[in-house]
Amino acid sequence: MLMAKSTKRITEISSIIANTVQIRPWQESDRPFLRTLYLHARREAWPWLNGAEWQLEDFDEATRDEVIWVAVQNGHRVGFASVWTNDNFLHNLFVDPQYQSLGVGHLLLEQVQKTFTSTGALKCLVRNERAIAFYQRHGWHIEATGD
């Protein structure tokens, strides 16, 4: 597990719409999709972990009391991010594998960073090299590593 912090300042944008992707606050009607995305995206991102016992309902516990942003493209939900705002902590950021590397994660991260009142933080599994590279490309740096 590594801890990362953002050093990159973000630019205010008047609209969170780019390349037909809109970032909006979550709605209860998003829950079924986000549960499914959370389950399947974790299994794909962390194949070395035993995801057999993970359940759709894990999303509910993992995002309890967090601010959730949903990425929507042409009416289809394609990703989400959740933040524990008290600590400026990015807890989850997952994009449907079909929409990865298309800028969706960038837009979600940009929105999350706009909500931070100070330096943001996150944890990322050390073996999740793709995610680490993503955050580093966006100005985050590793503060510490551990189990």
Where are each of the predicted segments found?
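Active-site acidic-Proline motif in GNAT/NAT acetyltransferases
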Residues: 96-102, 126-127
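Conserved acetyl-CoA-binding loop-helix of GNAT-fold acetyltransferases
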Residues: 101-114, 133, 137
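Conserved N-terminal entry element of GNAT/NAT acetyltransferase domains
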Residues: 1-29
